[in-house]
């Protein structure tokens, strides 16, 4: 199978090489961080003036590298001062006090460092404490719809979109295939690996059954406003007693492993961020569907909202849930410099009541920022309704806004 290059990420990485900046590739396991690093390695290795030091902590041959002393020794043995050194370390969080090595080699001339990791808290805390702002974090997401088409050799049509909605964008599915049993088995395996290595072991969690029940609850309630208290009450009704503090901690651990994303509420009129009642979305809608038992009746709205959220992040927006006095906006999206848009996500707008709900809340916002409704309404490509742009999901995923 030919290697498919995710060029936008490669371009981001290349922009920061040679600038004395540590490049940190972050994201959930199995979304393609290792492949990005290998692509950079393969590009640089062909130049004889370069020296590549490559460490993959998921390979047994690198098991002896457990501490920063081990890392220093390995790099020192392979470092060539007469060449441009590229130090590439995959899943670096598995090396104790790795940041001490990174700090020492960052100041070496003609040296670039690229590392990957699957734990947000550990990477940001250690790197920011030790080396300050001299690093660039690049977030790697699961496949976009356009990438999904490329990886699976599909033509853009309704059938391909249905497959993307159902199975999501884990790159490894290109080898596994999109037969339901095989795809779901692979997704559950990845989910269990993330849960074990990046949540349970990393945070020494003992109440594993509750953690699994919590993830299922969040999968069933994707895109709904949720508080720790509401989860605690639900769990109590199911015969399981747990504190709100423990729930907050567990959710934080899931977000740090990038399997889950928390979206805060934003008061559109008061222009402030609320501290309670957030929404949660999954990194990959295929994993979300596997956890929830597939896309059941009534789930399609949740999955579409999850896909739209992820693509808005991919387009570079900071995303919030919009709160009105008498309603809600699915997404308030901002960029540095003052850019803002409002987005409502819907499945199919099939009657007047649905139309009034989706468009009415946007009409209630009395400013001039762009407003969008994204849906799968048949025969729709893109149209304008009194200043609100209605766009089909496929067009949004292939062309943006």
Regions found by a protein language model. Name each.
Residues 118-120, 125-225, 229:
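Interdomain motor-coupling "hinge/lid" segment immediately C-terminal to the ATP-binding subdomain
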């Amino acid at each position: 199978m030919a290697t498919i290059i995710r060029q936008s990420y490669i371009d981001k990485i290349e922009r920061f090489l040679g600038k004395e900046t540590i490049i940190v590739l972050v994201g959930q396991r199995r979304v393609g961080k290792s492949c990005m690093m290998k692509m950079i390695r393969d590009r640089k290795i062909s130049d004889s003036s370069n020296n590549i030091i490559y460490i993959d902590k998921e390979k047994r041959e690198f098991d002896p590298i457990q501490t920063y002393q081990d890392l220093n020794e390995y790099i020192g043995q392979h470092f060539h001062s007469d060449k441009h050194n590229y130090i590439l370390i995959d899943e670096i969080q598995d090396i104790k006090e790795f940041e001490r090595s990174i700090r020492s080699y960052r100041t070496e001339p003609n040296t670039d460092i690229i590392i990957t990791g699957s734990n947000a808290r550990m990477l940001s805390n250690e790197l920011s404490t030790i080396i300050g702002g001299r690093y660039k974090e690049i977030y790697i997401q699961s496949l976009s719809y356009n990438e999904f088409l490329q990886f699976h050799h599909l033509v853009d049509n309704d059938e391909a979109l249905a497959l993307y909605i159902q199975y999501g964008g884990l790159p490894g599915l290109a080898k596994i295939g999109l037969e339901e049993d095989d795809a779901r088995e692979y997704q559950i395996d990845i989910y269990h690996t993330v849960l074990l290595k990046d949540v349970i072991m990393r945070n020494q969690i003992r109440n594993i059954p509750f953690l699994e029940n919590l993830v299922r609850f969040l999968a069933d309630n994707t895109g709904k406003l949720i508080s720790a208290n509401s989860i605690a009450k639900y769990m109590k009704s199911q015969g399981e007693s747990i504190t709100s503090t423990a729930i907050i901690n567990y959710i934080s651990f899931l977000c740090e492993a990038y399997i889950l994303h928390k979206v805060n509420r934003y008061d559109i009129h008061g222009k402030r961020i609320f501290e309670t009642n957030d929404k949660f979305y999954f990194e990959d809608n295929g994993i979300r569907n596997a956890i929830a038992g597939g896309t059941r009746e009534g789930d399609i709205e949740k999955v579409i909202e999850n896909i739209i959220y992820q693509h808005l992040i991919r387009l570079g927006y900071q995303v919030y849930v919009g709160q009105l006095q008498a309603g809600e906006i699915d997404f308030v999206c901002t960029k540095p410099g003052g850019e803002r848009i409002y987005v409502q996500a819907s499945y199919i707008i099939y009657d007047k009541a649905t139309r009034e709900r989706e468009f009415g809340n946007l009409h209630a916002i009395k400013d001039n920022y762009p407003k969008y409704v994204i849906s799968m309404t048949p025969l729709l490509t893109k149209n304008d309704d009194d200043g609100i742009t209605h766009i089909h999901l496929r067009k949004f995923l292939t062309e943006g806004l």
